[in-house]
Regions:
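Residues on the lipid-exposed face of transmembrane beta-strands in outer-membrane beta-barrel proteins
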Residues: 293, 358-362, 394-398, 493-499, ...
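Surface-exposed loop/interface segments of Gram-negative outer-membrane beta-barrel transport/assembly proteins
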Residues: 148, 224-225, 230, 236, ...
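Short, small/polar-rich motifs associated with maturation and membrane association
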Residues: 2-414, 492-493, 614
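Active-site-adjacent bridging/hinge elements
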Residues: 265, 367-372, 466-472, 594-600, ...
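Positively charged, low-complexity/disordered segments
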Residues: 688-689
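Short glycine/threonine-rich loop-to-helix capping motif typified by GTGT followed
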Residues: 648-653
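Transmembrane beta-barrel architecture of outer-membrane proteins
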Residues: 185, 209, 286, 353-357, ...
Length: 689
């Protein structure tokens, strides 16, 4: 039986072989390695910390009186049915983040209160719940879970499949993986938690975009980001900011997936292989992130209030040379030994991220409702960088006609504001001037970044150096007087209807409207370097609308005939995307620092802007999986897309086929005796896309 998670042995082109090692045979070897690794982990300094408080009111068991009870230390031991201790078993107080894991001898210890319920879970074993009645040691025996190998996972287009039937890799991430320590963009909390997936958080500051790359970059010049799919429907993941990898970059931004409230997410599935994404066409060439949101409870009502507060600091600074200083009035450090040194770390702040959420869940067997409201407020480590978001969501699922008809409706509304997300460019980024500041000069002096000018009768930038051929300015001026803001209002409305024709066939129809309205402004104050603003300043005011409409219909078949199983899906979809941007920018005219469109200098350096596009794609797709004795599975998929941008070309459409094979070798053949001591499960996968 399955004792641990699958261990990848090799992955050559499109061939995967998975072996599961028996724990007890490896225990002595791993014990010493684990102790050494633990010692190393304890030596690593921590540069951030977080705290979370969660209060849950349940209609069946109100826990309000728990704070009045005295905590006790609960000790116990966890073994399997043969009496062998289990290592790394999760022991968690239900409804809280208070938990621990068992040691090498299966022992655990944690503080809890009488009446608390302990949930004991381990991969390959059935989860067990124990109610604490006293502080006597617990003896817990976990039973092997034979259902693990037959676990059902959500795949492309929301299709549910047995995990062992898949010819590609699917990794599931539960809610607690990104909700224990929350980020303004929840994808950033998944860094290092999914094998084969690289997640890079941008350096734009609080609320910045996250880049998800599965199994390496596929292109040097094109987008390598994965496709995001919410409850089976693709999401438009636009970035409101300009390019962030150019020296001329001005306004970075967040991405569409960052708008989601992590507390509304039940789980995330990562489809890392191209075959896994074949049903989505070229949009999923880089992999798919399937996001499954929460539904209402059945026969249970709960109210949950959570707070998560995180602080962040600069992790690392570049090493500065202190052997050479600068001469009086010079910028370059080619002089004598420095007599005083500045620390650029003084420029940075301590960042913070505060997320508050209240959610309500209730329902019956016929109707379930989930609703939530959330606020996110973040400040970055760079001065004057902030991000705020307000999320409101509701989802209702109802069954009709003796459960043959299911209606699933959801709505989300997001208000987002960000300020001074820092681009990676050279000109609108305070970091170059900060790091190049002369080592021998007084850095504290430039903290007063503006001083009163009698001649101009206004505050002007203080920077006792010229631009040095690199358009350098006072870093504090860039952070406080070259402001960039984005205001965003977004709504997502979706509906799904499923009709069960028979036990083995159903029809599904879904539609989603995703609309985002932006207002993006830039304000550069008078005395900003002339390359970037006129004598009286610079102003840019742009509005933008993204509207994405998606709809599909699909027939699903799940039939078993003697030793054979047949799963088939056939359907069609349409996606309609409209993008519009309009506004203007230019130097200010008569009144310095008066940022209105009427004060723009229309006779010099004024640039009206208006652009956009309308794109539509229509698709048909099909999937066929044939299984034999739950041991061998053959999967065929195909999708054809008709793109509006290719309507009058020689190739108006594209076809995406794939074939996959999955063989559970350990169920087909009895393993040799010499292998059975260490291997309990073998699985062969192959696919071609």
């Amino acid at each position: 039986m399955l004792r641990q998670s699958y261990l990848p042995i090799f992955d050559l082109i499109n061939l995967n072989l998975y072996l599961t090692l028996k724990q007890n045979k490896m225990k002595k070897i791993m014990k010493h390695k684990f102790q050494y690794m633990l010692l190393l982990l304890l030596a690593i300094p921590c540069h951030s910390f977080a705290g979370e408080k969660s209060h849950v009111a349940d209609s069946e068991n109100l826990l309000l009186n728990k704070s009045l009870q005295q905590s006790v230390t609960i000790k116990g031991n966890v073994t399997d049915a043969a009496g062998e201790p289990l290592i790394g078993v999760s022991v968690l107080v239900k409804g809280t983040t208070n938990g621990t894991i068992t040691d090498f001898d299966g022992n655990f210890s944690l503080s809890a209160q009488k009446g608390d319920i302990l949930e004991i879970s381990y991969i390959g074993y059935a989860t067990q719940s124990v109610t604490i009645t006293n502080n006597q040691p617990l003896k817990i025996v976990l039973k092997e879970d034979t259902k693990v190998l037959d676990e059902v996972v959500v795949t492309a287009l929301g299709i549910k499949r047995e995990q062992k039937a898949l010819s590609y890799n699917v990794q599931q991430v539960k809610n607690d993986a990104f909700n224990t320590v929350k980020e303004a963009n929840f994808m950033s909390a998944l860094v290092g938690k999914v094998a084969g997936v690289t997640i890079n958080s941008s350096s734009t500051g609080a609320g910045g975009a996250a880049r998800v790359i599965m199994r390496g970059s596929k292109s040097i010049t094109k987008d390598n980001n994965a496709l995001y799919v919410i409850d089976g429907i693709p999401m438009f993941n636009a970035n409101a900011g300009g390019a962030s990898d150019s020296r001329y970059s001005t306004q970075a931004g967040s991405d569409g997936v960052a708008d989601l409230n992590p507390d509304d997410i039940e789980s995330i599935n990562m489809l890392t292989g191209p075959s896994a994404a074949a049903l989505y066409g070229n949009a999923a060439a880089n992999g798919v992130v399937l996001i499954n949101t929460k539904k209402g409870n059945v026969e249970r009502t709960s109210l949950t209030v959570t707070n998560n507060t995180t602080f962040s600091d600069v992790y690392m600074m570049p090493e500065m040379q202190n052997r050479y200083g600068n001469m009086e009035g010079a910028f370059e450090s080619w002089g004598g030994t420095t007599t005083k040194r500045y620390d650029p770390k003084k420029f940075f702040n301590t960042g913070s991220n505060v997320i508050n959420t209240i959610s309500f869940s209730t329902g019956t067997k016929k109707n379930q409702t989930y609703a939530s409201a959330s606020t996110t407020h973040s400040t970055g480590i760079i001065p004057n960088n902030s991000y705020s978001r307000y999320n409101f969501s509701i989802r209702n699922t109802a069954n009709f006609l003796n459960d043959k008809l299911t209606l699933d409706l959801s709505a989300n509304y997001i208000i987002q504001n960000d300020k001074n997300m820092t681009s990676q460019g050279e000109y609108f980024n305070p970091i170059p001037a900060l790091y190049l500041f002369p080592r021998n000069d007084n850095f504290d002096e430039i903290q007063l970044y503006e001083r009163y000018s009698v001649g101009r009768d206004l505050m002007v930038q203080y920077w006792p150096y010229d631009a040095q051929g690199m358009s350098l300015q006072n870093p504090y001026w860039i952070a406080n007087r070259m402001n960039r803001t984005t205001k965003k209002n977004r709504y997502m409305i979706s509906g799904g209807l499923t009709y069960k024709i028979a036990d083995w066939v159903n029809v599904v129809g879904r539609v989603k409207v995703d609309n985002s309205d932006y207002r993006m402004q830039q304000k550069r104050y008078a005395s900003t370097l002339g390359t970037f603003a006129g004598a009286n300043g610079f102003y840019s005011d742009m509005t933008r609308t993204d509207r994405n409409i998606y709809a599909d219909v699909m027939v699903n078949i799940d039939k078993r005939i003697k030793d054979f199983s047949i799963n088939a899906n056939i359907g069609a979809s349409i996606k309609d995307l409209v993008y519009e941007q309009m506004g203007g920018e230019g130097d200010l005219a008569g009144i310095p620092n008066f940022f209105t469109v009427r004060n723009l200098n229309y006779s010099s350096n004024f640039k009206p802007k208006q652009f956009g596009y309308h794109d539509q794609s229509q698709s048909i797709f099909a999937n066929l999986e044939v299984g034999w004795k739950s041991q061998v599975y053959l999967t065929l998929t195909g999708r054809n897309d008709w793109e509006s941008m290719l309507a009058y070309t020689d190739t108006p459409s594209f076809f995406y086929p794939s074939v996959g094979l999955s063989v559970v070798l350990s169920e087909m053949f009895k393993l040799p005796e010499f292998m059975s001591y260490a291997v309990s499960y073998t699985h062969l996968r192959a696919h071609e896309t």
